[in-house]
């Protein structure tokens, strides 16, 4: 339920920084206004989620954080972003950020790990710290099956799979880009490997925009003439395909 409600708020309440006049500050608006307008800033998106969670029977509260920065342990206004927390059955507080997870398979953006936040509970709470997200939550896997002929032409297929922040990065062309650019974007990945690459086909499923269904998976079929060069003794010289400028935007090295 928590995941469903978080993603509904993330995907259906549009971020729009419209001035509401003086004195707004951190004031949370009521659900009727947020649900009717279907837009607002972070506090409106978080406020919608908090109201939904409470209606679903959860204890949920607003929380403040400083996106991208540390919050000092002194009484001062160090906050620039409103998020939400929900109390789990074991009593722990789970941070949720619907503003930063549209089209993302997370509930809190792991681009903001080890970040301070201050829950607004009735009894009061000290500064908290968001947990580290293990690399396994953001894997990228590329499996290729290729053959080289005597002329150095590479033919084959590769499949890329990804999760978490890596999924969001690779899937972005489908969730925020124009559909007319999908095939061109896929082809550009191969052209990064070689300007002679030819994309034969690409399979990204029927609904690549549906990020909640499963981790992203794309299969390419291609041909690259003169991928390998012949040495003086007839040997083939080439760089391993999956290490040759393929999806470099999600590599961490």
Residue ranges and their predicted role:
Residues 1-253:
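A sensor for short, sequence-defined functional sites
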């Amino acid at each position: 339920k928590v995941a469903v409600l978080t993603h509904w708020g993330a995907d259906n309440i549009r971020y729009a920084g419209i001035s509401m006049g003086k004195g707004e500050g951190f004031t949370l608006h009521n659900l009727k206004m947020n649900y009717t307008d279907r837009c607002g800033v972070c506090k409106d998106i978080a406020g919608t989620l908090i109201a939904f969670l409470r209606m679903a029977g959860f204890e949920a509260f607003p929380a403040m954080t400083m996106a991208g920065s540390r919050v000092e342990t002194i009484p001062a206004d160090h906050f620039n972003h409103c998020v939400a927390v929900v109390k789990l059955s074991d009593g722990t507080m789970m941070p949720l950020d619907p503003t930063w997870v549209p089209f993302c398979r997370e509930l809190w953006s792991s681009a903001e790990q080890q970040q301070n936040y201050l829950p607004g509970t009735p009894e009061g709470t000290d500064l908290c710290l968001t947990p580290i997200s293990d690399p396994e939550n953001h894997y990228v896997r590329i499996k290729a099956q290729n053959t080289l002929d005597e002329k150095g032409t590479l033919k084959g297929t590769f499949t890329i799979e990804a999760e978490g922040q890596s999924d969001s990065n690779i899937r972005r062309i489908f969730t925020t880009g124009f559909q007319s650019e999908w095939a061109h974007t896929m082809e550009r990945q191969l052209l990064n490997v070689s300007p002679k690459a030819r994309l034969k086909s690409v399979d990204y499923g029927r609904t690549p925009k549906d990020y909640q269904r499963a981790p992203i998976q794309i299969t390419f079929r291609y041909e690259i003439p003169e991928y390998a060069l012949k040495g003086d003794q007839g040997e083939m010289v080439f760089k391993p395909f999956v290490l040759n400028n393929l999806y470099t935007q999600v590599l961490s090295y």
